[in-house]
Swiss-Prot record:
Pathway in which the depicted protein is active: Purine metabolism; IMP biosynthesis via de novo pathway; 5-amino-1-(5-phospho-D-ribosyl)imidazole-4-carboxamide from 5-amino-1-(5-phospho-D-ribosyl)imidazole-4-carboxylate: step 1/2
Entry's EC annotation: 6.3.2.6
Organism: Chlorobium phaeobacteroides (strain DSM 266 / SMG 266 / 2430)
HAMAP family, alphabetized: SAICAR_synth (MF_00137)
Descriptive protein name: Phosphoribosylaminoimidazole-succinocarboxamide synthase
Keyword annotations of the record: ATP-binding, Ligase, Nucleotide-binding, Purine biosynthesis
CDD domains (UniProt xref): SAICAR_synt_PurC
Catalytic activity line of the entry: 5-amino-1-(5-phospho-D-ribosyl)imidazole-4-carboxylate + L-aspartate + ATP = (2S)-2-[5-amino-1-(5-phospho-beta-D-ribosyl)imidazole-4-carboxamido]succinate + ADP + phosphate + 2 H(+)
GO molecular function: ATP binding; phosphoribosylaminoimidazolesuccinocarboxamide synthase activity
InterPro entries hit by this protein: SAICAR_synt/ADE2_N, SAICAR_synt_PurC, SAICAR_synth, SAICAR_synthetase, SAICAR_synthetase_CS
Length: 236
């Protein structure tokens, strides 16, 4: 399978068409951004690490009956995927208070939520990806009520699988972002699952092991990403 035309280039990945109309190649970049592209930089070998982690986690979810866009890992940076019609809803699942949840509602960082929170955000960089509810999403025409129910249910199921997986590897899954898309009349999980899209804290020390280290100039970004990769793959 080879790349043909560049279909889309985002902050962290490029997506290429292939000689099969329903398949694309997702190429992971080392570019790093934060605060909706206001901060930019690079993280050495981030693309390699995120591809490896994402492929492993998509495979894990498939094993638990959760359908994803993954077809196979092609190379260190390339993932062969089913082509999706992306739903313009970013789904965020929160287990522990951090980030914007702390700023918006005054939770103390690290507060363990009684139940996981599932939030919807409009996928629109120009509007800074605003928080929205089901009524907003339907009014905007980005998803139907039925689709939103599927996204919420799917996100909750993914959270159950991933929380246990990471706990077994001495990591707290604080929160994470998911993207979904339509493919041949079904909704599949797309994008990636990585330290770019998740908050990971060490189970014993609460050390942050994700893109917050880049966001807030904490240093040790590459080491944190590599350590997450090591833990994700170490029991395979």
């Amino acid at each position: 399978m080879t790349k043909t035309t560049l279909l889309h280039e985002g902050k962290a990945k490029k997506v290429f068409l292939t000689d099969q109309s329903d398949l694309v190649i997702q190429e992971f970049k080392d570019d790093a951004t934060a605060f909706n592209n206001k901060k930019k930089g690079t993280i050495a070998d981030k693309g390699v690490v995120n591809n490896a982690i994402s492929c492993r986690l998509f495979t894990l979810l498939e094993e638990h009956g959760i359908r994803t866009h993954l077809v196979e890992k092609l190379s260190d940076r390339d993932m062969l995927c089913k082509r999706l019609d992306i739903i313009k809803v970013e789904v965020v699942v929160r287990n522990i208070a951090a980030g914007s949840l702390v700023k918006r509602y005054g939770f103390k960082e690290g507060f363990v939520l009684q139940e996981p929170l599932v939030e919807f955000y409009l996928k629109d960089d120009d509007l800074d990806d605003p928080l929205m509810n089901d009524f907003h999403a339907v009014a905007l025409g980005v998803a139907t009520s039925e689709e939103l129910a599927i996204l919420r249910s799917r996100a909750e199921a993914i959270n159950l699988v991933l929380r246990q997986f990471f706990a077994d590897r001495k990591l707290k899954l604080v929160d994470f972002k998911l993207e979904f898309g339509r493919h041949k009349n079904e909704i599949l999980l797309g994008d990636e699952i990585s330290p770019d899209t998740c908050r990971f804290w060490d189970l014993d020390t609460n050390e942050k092991m994700d893109k917050d280290r880049f966001r807030f100039d904490m240093g040790g970004v590459e080491n944190a990403y590599s350590e997450v990769q090591k833990r994700v793959l170490e029991l395979d």
